[in-house]
Design a protein with these regions (language model features):
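Solvent-exposed loop/turn and edge beta-strand elements of beta-rich ligand-binding domains
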Residues: 1-305
Length: 305
């Protein structure tokens, strides 16, 4: 079984689950060494995304009465974002002799989670529960300042996803939101990396959905300092070191929570030279009005003469 954490829309990836069986203990039998116990096998389980995988345990033929206990462990898989159940289950098989036929038979069997754990109802409960953890990457854009373009200008971003070595990933991750019509609908993931270019303007938010736990991401905005924009990322200077790199980037790791990267581009100019001093503007306007009035009077007098 799979427990999915974070987004309600997230679906655990399909994979083949494998198991390891160990002869654990034997009692009430002429067999005293567990290594001499008959072998139990567990078939591989095909887990289909969004469903529950059924596990088939194959019991052997027994030649001795006794109580046989086997340890069954799930082998750790490679699906990104999945935490595999490390607690084994213990199968106990009771073999008795039929007094009427003298034949051996399996009288009872049962499962426990852990050595001293609770009984597992294989008919309705899950013997193994794996956790699939995802998080969304949210990218926001704001433009501030008296000269900032808050209506039409789109800013270019490059989003790069990098996976962990040895892990398997989905072929793509959906991109939603934003107002730019040509933004891609997903980031195509090729092996361990994927890159997409998106455009955001003031007030836009784009979300890359259901990134598996442990996925690294980098969000880089183009350099707009030539247009007199000053960039900050999550409140820090776009040129600081650390998680914010010198190329206006935010680099972090998905940890099963929504990660928000907020880019703010500020363009402020307090010294705009228009050739007019605002402190004198009312007087200049009044003076221009006086000149206009004089001109009208002069023209009228000439016409009368």
């Amino acid at each position: 079984d799979y427990e999915v954490r974070t987004g309600e829309e997230a679906v655990a990836p399909g994979e083949t689950l494998t198991f390891n069986v160990t002869k654990y203990a034997v009692s009430d039998s002429s067999i005293t060494n567990p290594a001499e116990m008959p072998e139990v096998t567990v078939d591989d389980a095909e887990y289909v995304a969004g469903n529950t995988a059924n596990i088939t345990v194959n019991l052997p033929s027994y030649s001795k009465v006794g109580v046989y206990t086997y340890e069954i462990k799930e082998n750790k898989g490679q699906s990104a974002g999945v935490t595999y159940d490390a607690t084994p289950i213990y199968l106990t098989v009771l073999v008795t002799r039929d007094e009427a036929t003298n034949a051996l038979k399996v009288t009872q069997y049962g499962f426990k989670k852990g050595v001293a754990g609770d009984k597992v109802d294989v008919g309705s409960g899950a013997a193994f529960t794996n956790s699939y953890v995802t998080g969304d990457l949210e990218i926001k854009k704001q433009v501030t300042g008296n000269m900032g373009d808050t209506t039409d200008k789109y800013f270019e971003f490059t989003v790069t996803l990098t996976g962990e070595d040895g892990k398997t990933y989905a072929g793509s991750y959906a991109i939603t939101g934003g107002s730019y019509a040509e933004n891609p609908e997903s980031i195509v993931f090729n092996g361990t990396t994927g890159t997409a270019t998106i455009y955001l303007k003031h007030g836009d938010t784009v979300t890359v959905q259901d990134l598996p736990d442990g996925m690294n991401y980098q969000v880089v905005e183009d350099d707009y300092s030539g247009e007199q924009y000053t960039t900050t990322v999550n409140g820090e200077s776009g040129r600081d070191s650390g998680t914010i790199t010198s190329d206006f980037a935010s680099e972090l790791t998905v940890t099963g929570e929504k990660a928000t990267v907020s880019f703010v581009n500020d363009k402020t100019d307090e010294n705009i030279d228009t050739g007019v001093y605002l402190d004198n503007l009312p007087y200049i306007i009044v003076f221009a009005g006086v000149l206009a009035a004089v001109a009208v009077l002069v023209i009228r007098r000439r016409r009368v003469d």
